[in-house]
From Swiss-Prot:
Keywords: Bacterial flagellum, Secreted. Individual Salmonella serotypes usually alternate between the production of 2 antigenic forms of flagella, termed phase 1 and phase 2, each specified by separate structural genes. GO terms for molecular function: structural molecule activity. One of its GO terms (cellular component) is bacterial-type flagellum. The gene is fliC. It is found in: Secreted; Bacterial flagellum. PANTHER family: FLAGELLIN. Belongs to the bacterial flagellin family. This is Flagellin. It comes from Salmonella rubislaw.
Amino acid sequence: MAQVINTNSLSLLTQNNLNKSQSALGTAIERLSSGLRINSAKDDAAGQAIANRFTANIKGLTQASRNANDGISIAQTTEGALNEINNNLQRVRELAVQSANSTNSQSDLDSIQAEITQRLNEIDRVSGQTQFNGVKVLAQDNTLTIQVGANDGETIDIDLKQINSQTLGLDTLNVQQKYKVSDTAATVTGYTDSATAIDKSTFAASATTLGGTPAITGDLKFDDTTGKYYADVSGTTAKDGVYEVTVAADGKVTLTGTPTGPITAGFPSTATKDVKQTQQENADLTEAKAALTAAGVAAAGHRSVVKMSYTDNNGKTIDGGLAVKVGDDYYSATQNKDGSISINTTKYTADNGTSKTALNKLGGADGKTEVVSIGGKTYAASKAEGHNFKAQPDLAEAAATTTENPLQKIDAALAQVDTLRSDLGAVQNRFNSAITNLGNTVNNLTSARSRIEDSDYATEVSNMSRAQILQQAGTSVLAQANQVPQNVLSLLR
């Protein structure tokens, strides 16, 4: 080896090794201080990518576990409300059993019904107001989807049902129901317009004359399809036939040609003539009289067919259909396609098996309330359904009878609540299982990620100690290497 002083190769070699040991010492100190084997992608590019995916899964599963706990909370909130509904139903059933006892007076039944109504109202309140984080859990049918995994589609559904007195089938539960009715009708043979005779022999329109003594014969006929009235016009020398009849407010009647009785060329399509003021009067109540009498309604006196209307809560006038007026009373009626009038009645069976008939009477404030008239007394029609009228003079004092299968209805409601509670209990157990599984998965993934990216302190401490020793040795050797050129100077002495 040549002896030179310009280039100190040994010093350069020593410096290079010293830099390596210093880099190794820095890496060891970084890993020991951070606790991570992979502090950047340069430490392990593949390991860094794998560990990053593990981190995403771990965070997703951890949040999914929290979601599952929220699902348990929702189910518990809902079940708590259902438990209170169940308590109310149990009390309603107890009251229904009490009401079935024939020793109860009417006032007893009224008191029992009052508490039943309050209990059902409380069920409706619980249903409408129970909520979890703004979600009303019993107010409507709903499915809540809970994310219990780190990936799409990893969900558990909570099926919620609307639970209130109506969905439970108890909104009409009434221990005061003592009657049973069914709808039928007493039919009037027809009614006639009593003032339709035309008292002049000519129609002035278009200077056309019918000739003879024209008159509207027979009853006015109502066509349900077109909503129009028709009449036969006879006694003319020009054109007998069927005409559409329209009566104006001023008392004028207009006859219009129809396909069944066309008006030919040279004859006007319409002809107008003054007639007497018309009314829908003289309803033929011959066949209905028996029903009126049976219902305790005197059929004598003035009778007419009138058109009814009423005003709803918004002030809007609503068509109330037809009614037959008997004296000062009005009874609901229906106009048939053939022009006849049917009085709407209610047929009921007395406890002795006798068939009875009641009329649907229009009464109450401003004629807005439809009632059933029986034996000279009136009862709200909406309260009549499901009743069994007693053939006694005063229905208010009629002996109480058992409501039709009230306990069966309540038991069905209890079963409906129990079914939903069972579903909620099952889904809670499912959430608990999911949470346990999520915890196990998170633990395993965390361990796997740790093996990839965490520092092995035993290894890193050894690496640091080795690097420190190499640093010390390198520094000492570098000092010696720097002295080598000095040896060359001895040759110059």
